[in-house]
């Protein structure tokens, strides 16, 4: 029984330990410090204090302490000026040192910074002049016009004889365009120059054939390869007699 009671006691003690640790974390030790404002962001509302004295004893190296605008003791817009002397209470947290209440020297209100956050500038459209589409007046709209419906006018010269699309006073530069809406390119010559090894250039143009030559080419291309081979084999005797002397000359 004694062993069982001892085990229960150890379990209860172990169960209380985390609770005690939480209570200690919730109630940290409040310390006193003094120093000056290192920097403060007026728009975001926070900054850091450079602590030079802790509990009345000076520090060799200044320590940074976080400060929020809600912890400042002052009236109006709460902020700190860079280099402003302050006194404060602070605590130690998992993120570092955080200030709890910040005042000026001797518990007086903080002076604060002269800077103010800039208001967001909303870009507004420029107000266009109101014009009546019926009579052209600038002090009312067409639905408020007292005149009866007026004839349509050219929006460029206010003439009733034509519309703005046919206005002779409005000059629109026109460029020649193709069917696809692109500008026509200047015609380029069909000749192409080739560079020689010696550095000169000569023009080469496509040969111009007559109608007879084109008909012969079309007939040749329409022939089958078998007909072409037969035409080579079946040559006339006149052609053979013509070729004969030339062959004899070559043999000599």
From Swiss-Prot:
Membership in a protein family: Belongs to the lin-28 family.
The protein's name: Protein lin-28 homolog B
Pfam families found in the cross-reference section: CSD (PF00313), Lin-28A-like_zf-CCHC_2 (PF21890), zf-CCHC (PF00098)
UniProt-annotated binding residues for Zn(2+) 2: 154, 157, 162, 167
Keywords: Metal-binding, Nucleus, Repeat, RNA-binding, RNA-mediated gene silencing, Zinc, Zinc-finger
Biased composition (Basic and acidic residues): 9-19, 213-222
GO cellular component assignments: cytoplasm; nucleolus; nucleus
Keyword Iron: no
């Amino acid at each position: 029984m004694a062993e069982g009671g001892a085990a229960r006691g150890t379990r209860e003690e172990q169960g209380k330990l985390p609770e005690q640790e939480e209570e200690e974390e919730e109630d940290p030790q409040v310390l006193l410090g003094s120093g000056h404002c290192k920097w403060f962001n007026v728009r975001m509302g926070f900054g850091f204090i450079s602590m030079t004295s802790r509990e009345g004893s000076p520090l060799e190296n200044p320590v940074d302490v976080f400060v929020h605008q809600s912890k400042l003791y002052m009236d109006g817009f709460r902020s700190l000026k860079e280099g402003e002397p302050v006194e404060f209470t602070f605590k130690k947290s998992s993120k570092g040192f955080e200030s709890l209440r910040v005042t000026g020297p001797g518990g007086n209100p903080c002076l604060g910074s002269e800077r103010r956050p800039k208001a967001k500038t909303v870009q507004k459209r420029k107000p266009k002049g109101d014009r009546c589409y019926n009579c052209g007046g600038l002090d009312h709209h067409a639905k408020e016009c007292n005149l009866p419906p007026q004839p349509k006018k050219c929006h460029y010269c206010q003439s009733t004889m034509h519309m703005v699309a046919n206005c002779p006073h409005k000059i629109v530069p026109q460029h020649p365009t193709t069917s696809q809406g692109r500008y026509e390119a200047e015609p380029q010559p069909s000749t192409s120059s080739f560079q020689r090894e010696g550095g000169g250039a000569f023009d080469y143009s496509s040969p111009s054939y007559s109608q007879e030559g084109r008909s012969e080419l079309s007939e040749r291309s329409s022939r089958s390869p078998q007909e072409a081979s037969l035409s080579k084999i079946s040559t006339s005797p006149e052609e053979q007699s013509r070729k004969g002397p030339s062959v004899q000359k070559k043999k000599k």
